């Protein structure tokens, strides 16, 4: 389960999506997320799924690797789906005592699952195809207008990127701790859900210690390289919008607008 969490990892590649300006990818990711919540019909979700599938294929990221990142949220999807199926009132399909399954509940559960899967894949594609440095530069550039009101834009962008980058690092450390404790007789697989959750408590203390140690090492390394924030800093690679970025943004906006018009005007 721990190794199945792939969001935050960068997958080296030479696809057009890897070469695209990181600002374009961030903007399109937010646009996609907004439209995921605006769509409320199955044919709309079908179109968004096809669009997402085309994006995944064009990124040259292995489909199995992308689907692997969905495994950690399966429990959340199933749990929330069961609650929706039994709690939402409507046309009863099946009932037993005080429990009843409704058509509306099933409908909401399916749509919620589709939304969560699309959101995770969309957010993951951003980190799969963008290096942490490029992501930091892009966030700082997009938030640049806030500098006029004395907002520490560079520091905010740096913290966001480091936090995102630490996800796979901490997950890898968690996996190592679990394996080390398992070799000493710890059991994380037997018992009910509550017992399994309790068995992970001994993992938390060494994990927190490791996290603080890694954070201290990172701070020391940054100071050793004379890092002093954004003042006077230059970039090895300057961000530039290309025709490809304009083309991709235009196609995405036109496609999403068409889907919304079909959703709210024609249907």
From Swiss-Prot:
Keywords: Cell membrane, Membrane, Transmembrane, Transmembrane helix, Transport. It is a multi-pass membrane protein. InterPro entries: ABC/ECF_trnsptr_transmembrane, ECF_transporter_component, EcfT. The chain crosses the membrane at residues 26-46, 73-93, 116-136, 151-171, 247-267. Disulfide bonds: none annotated. One of its GO terms (cellular component) is plasma membrane. The keyword Manganese does not apply. One of its GO terms (molecular function) is transmembrane transporter activity. CDD domains: EcfT. It comes from the Bacteria. It holds the Pfam family CbiQ. It is found in: Cell membrane. The keyword Transmembrane applies. Belongs to the energy-coupling factor EcfT family. PANTHER family: SLL0384 PROTEIN (PTHR34857:SF2). Forms a stable energy-coupling factor (ECF) transporter complex composed of 2 membrane-embedded substrate-binding proteins (S component), 2 ATP-binding proteins (A component) and 2 transmembrane proteins (T component). May be able to interact with more than 1 S component at a time. Transmembrane (T) component of an energy-coupling factor (ECF) ABC-transporter complex. Unlike classic ABC transporters this ECF transporter provides the energy necessary to transport a number of different substrates. This is Energy-coupling factor transporter transmembrane protein EcfT. It comes from Ruminiclostridium cellulolyticum (strain ATCC 35319 / DSM 5812 / JCM 6584 / H10). The lineage of its organism: Bacteria, Bacillati, Bacillota, Clostridia, Eubacteriales.
């Amino acid at each position: 389960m721990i190794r199945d969490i792939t969001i935050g990892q960068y997958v080296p590649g030479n696809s057009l999506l890897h070469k695209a300006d990181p600002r374009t990818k961030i903007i399109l990711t937010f646009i996609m997320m907004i439209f995921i919540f605006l769509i409320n019909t199955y044919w709309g979700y079908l179109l968004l799924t096809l669009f997402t599938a085309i994006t995944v294929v064009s990124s040259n990221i292995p489909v199995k690797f992308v689907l692997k990142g969905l495994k950690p949220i399966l429990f959340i999807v199933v749990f929330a789906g069961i609650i929706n199926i039994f709690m939402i009132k409507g046309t009863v399909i099946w009932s037993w005592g005080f429990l009843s399954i409704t058509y509306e509940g099933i409908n909401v559960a399916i749509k919620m699952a589709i939304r969560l899967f699309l959101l995770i894949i969309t957010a993951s594609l951003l980190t799969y195809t963008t290096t942490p440095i490029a992501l930091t530069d892009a966030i700082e550039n997009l938030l640049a207008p806030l500098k006029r009101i004395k907002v520490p834009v560079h520091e905010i962008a740096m913290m966001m990127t480091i936090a995102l980058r630490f996800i796979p690092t901490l997950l890898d450390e968690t996996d190592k701790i679990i394996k080390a404790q398992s070799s000493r007789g710890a059991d994380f697989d037997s018992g009910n859900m509550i017992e399994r959750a309790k068995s992970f408590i001994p993992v938390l203390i060494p994990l927190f210690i490791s996290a603080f140690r890694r954070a201290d090492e990172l701070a020391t390394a940054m100071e050793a390289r004379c890092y002093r924030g954004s003042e006077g800093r230059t970039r090895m690679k300057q961000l530039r919008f290309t025709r490809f970025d304009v083309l991709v943004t235009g196609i995405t906006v036109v496609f999403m607008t068409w889907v919304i018009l079909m959703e709210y005007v024609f249907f």
